[in-house]
Regions:
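Nucleic acid-binding interface residues in structured DNA/RNA-binding domains
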Residues: 3-116
Length: 116
């Protein structure tokens, strides 16, 4: 299976068969975030049943082999800032802005209407 044929959650799971169960769960949860919405590392950790594993979520997303199909750019810190190295954070900011998310002073103002 190649990246261009991935359309469904099942496709993502099949493509990620070489990842750990935790990494697969994180990437599948991230795959579900719709355009124009964001989530946080903590919320993803909670969704996959590991509420204190938000740093592990960030680590799994850093190794995302399916970007932008699995839109890791839509996952931010709980304070609305973009995690990771500045160069990667800037690229993620640009992608999120193109999707219609408002950024003020380098961070997203997290509200219920954009939170997934």
């Amino acid at each position: 299976m190649n990246e261009s044929s991935i359309r469904t959650e099942e496709d993502v799971i099949r493509f990620l068969s070489n990842k750990t169960e935790f990494e697969r769960k994180v990437l599948v949860a991230t795959f579900k975030i719709p355009k124009g919405k964001i989530s946080t590392y903590k919320r993803i950790a909670e969704k996959v049943g590991r509420p204190r594993a938000y740093r592990a979520v960030a680590s799994a997303l850093k190794k995302n082999p399916l970007h932008p199909i699995v839109p890791c750019h839509r996952v931010v810190r709980s304070d609305g800032r973009f995690g990771g190295e500045e160069e990667r954070a800037e690229a993620r900011r640009e992608l999120v802005e193109k999707e219609g998310i408002l950024i003020e002073n380098g961070r997203i103002r997290i509200s219920d209407d954009i939170l997934f």
